[in-house]
A protein has these predicted regions:
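Generic N-terminal targeting/processing segments that precede catalytic cores or assembly contacts
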Residues: 1-157, 161-163
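Conserved small/polar residues in nucleotide/adenosyl-binding loops
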Residues: 274-277
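Conserved mixed alpha/beta catalytic, RNA-binding, or beta-rich assembly cores of soluble enzyme
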Residues: 106-110, 114, 118-132, 149-272
Length: 277
């Protein structure tokens, strides 16, 4: 199975390429960055537009053998130079443009009002652009704007509307790598939703393995689905997360077949992981 690369890796690569072309005046058709996982990523650079104090370019997201909705989309970076600075160290300002979401609810990686560019991608962008600044002996200010032309439409197919991220997708990734058929991504989504519910003051986690339980909560009790979390088969991990985040109780609603497994101490309810004798 072939690895892919996250939107964070693509944003860092595009920002590095744009900064390089701006500060050197040379065209860069491919660029290499180091991902947090230690795997180098070499990306083709497209859509190059050069100006006197600004360069923009794009990198096409490659999701590998486990593509998500962002695979094939262009992750763009526009870097603008501003010579103001202390003359000793470069200053980098990172923001999101068209197609990158804005955070409107607490409990996420970024504070309310910020572009939904998570902290690891921000660190990656900073590290890669700082490398270019050192090579070019640049000590001014660079404004880095990350955008995704089709990001607003793509976001409707993600968890972002549910999480209160409006206007586009998030720039994500903790390792820089998209692992094929990774269950870790789903578990991280569960953690994000639980953390957000806790930040908004909830003390009881309303959880369901799937749509059956969510529909039951809504139709029978009129429960607000924005206050519930779908945990798939990862019930044990979800209970642990809720405890770590300080919830005092959990309401677990689902199909009787799933709940019988939990009653028997089976905390991952995937059908391939348990068979009766």
């Amino acid at each position: 199975m072939r690895y892919g690369f996250t939107t964070g890796s693509c944003a860092a690569a595009a920002a590095k390429a744009a900064a390089y072309m701006l500060l050197t005046g040379k065209i860069k058709n491919c660029i290499t960055i180091e991902t947090p996982k230690g795997i180098p990523y070499t990306a083709e650079v497209t859509d190059i537009v050069r100006g006197e104090s600004q360069v923009s370019c794009a990198v096409v997201k490659d999701g590998g053998d486990d593509p998500d909705v962002t695979s094939g989309s262009k992750i763009c970076a526009t870097v603008t130079a501003d010579n103001r600075g202390d003359g000793e160290k470069e200053l980098l300002q990172i923001d999101g443009g068209k197609g990158v979401g804005r955070v409107t609810r607490p409990g996420l990686d970024q504070p309310v009002g910020n572009a939904a560019i998570n902290h690891v991608p921000r660190e990656m962008i900073t590290r890669e652009v700082q490398e270019v600044c050192r090579i070019c002996d640049f000590h001014g200010t660079l404004h880095i704007l990350i955008s995704v032309p089709d990001g607003e439409a793509l976001a409707e197919r993600t968890f972002n509307p549910r999480l209160g991220i409006v206007g586009g997708i998030s720039i994500l990734g903790t390792t820089g790598i998209v692992e094929p058929m990774s269950s870790q991504a789903l578990k991280e989504t569960i953690r994000v939703e639980l953390r957000q519910q806790r930040a908004e003051g909830q003390t009881i986690a309303a959880v369901s393995p799937g749509n059956y339980g969510l529909d039951f909560m809504q139709q029978t009790y009129g429960y607000d689905l924005d206050r519930s979390v779908k945990c798939s088969n990862f019930i044990g991990e979800t209970i642990d997360m809720a405890a770590e985040l300080g919830f005092c109780a959990m309401l677990l609603t689902g199909h009787i077949g799933k709940l019988i497994k939990v009653a028997g101490g089976i905390m991952n309810t995937h059908c391939l992981l348990y068979t009766s004798d």
